[in-house]
Amino acid sequence: MSTRKLNMLTPEPIHLLEEGGDNSEEFVVDEGCQVQRIYVGDGSITTSDEAKFTIWKVTTELIVHKVEPVRVSIPLEIVSYRRYSEFDQLRAEIISKIGKNVQVPELPPKVYWYDYWRFSKINLNRHWLNKRRQGLDNFINKIIKNKDIMESCAKEVNEFLGVSSDVSTRTNSE
C-alpha cells in the first residue's frame, strides 16, 4: 500500500495586464458566459508510487448572463487541477491545430531527463515552484487573451479549464 503526502503552497495569483490597453475587457466563453479571471495557485505536491509531482489548482471565474425572466449576471467559479504535463499537452494541441501562423505562448522550463535525479529537490523548492506557477498563470492568461487562438481552439481551452459549452444552460436551469 502506497502512502500519499500533500504539501500545500500558498496561492499567489498574478494578473496579466496588456500594455496600453483597457484591461477590463471580458472574454466570451459562449453566448451567455464571460471569463472574468483565471489564475493558477495552490500547488500541491503529491507522492504516488515513489513519484513526486505537483498538481496545480486552476481557478476560472466566470460571469453567466441570464436574460429570462429578469436580466441578471451570476458569478460562477470553476476549479480544475492540472499537472505541468497537461499544460504542455494543451500547448501541443493548440500548435497542431493552428500551426505556426500564430505565436503560442511559452511554458516555464521543463525539468529535463538529465536533471531528473535532482527533480525531487527542485520539486520541493518553494522559490522554483512559485516561478513555475507564475509561468503557468502567464501562459493560460496569454492563451485566453489571444483572439486567434481562442477562435480556433476554444473547445480545447474550455475543456482544459473545465468550462463546458453548456455552462450557461446549466446555471440557468438551477
Curated annotation (Swiss-Prot):
Places the protein is found: Endosome membrane; Vacuole membrane
GO MF entry, a single one: protein-macromolecule adaptor activity
SUPFAM superfamilies for the chain: PX domain (SSF64268)
PROSITE patterns in UniProt: PX
Limits of the PX domain: 34-168
Pfam families xrefs: PX
Bilayer-spanning residue ranges: none
Keyword Membrane: yes
Swiss-Prot/TrEMBL keywords: Endosome, Membrane, Vacuole
InterPro entries: PX_dom (IPR001683), PX_dom_sf (IPR036871), Ypt35_PX (IPR037917)
GO biological process, one term: protein localization to endosome
GO cellular component, one term: endosome membrane
Chief location category: membrane
Keyword Membrane: yes
Membrane topology, from the record: Peripheral membrane protein
Domain remarks: The PX domain binds phosphatidylinositol 3-phosphate (PtdIns(3)P) which is necessary for peripheral membrane localization.
Function, in words: Recruits the lipid transfer protein VPS13 to endosomal and vacuolar membranes.
Family: Belongs to the YPT35 family.
Record protein name field: Endosomal/vacuolar adapter protein YPT35
Organism of origin: Vanderwaltozyma polyspora (strain ATCC 22028 / DSM 70294 / BCRC 21397 / CBS 2163 / NBRC 10782 / NRRL Y-8283 / UCD 57-17)
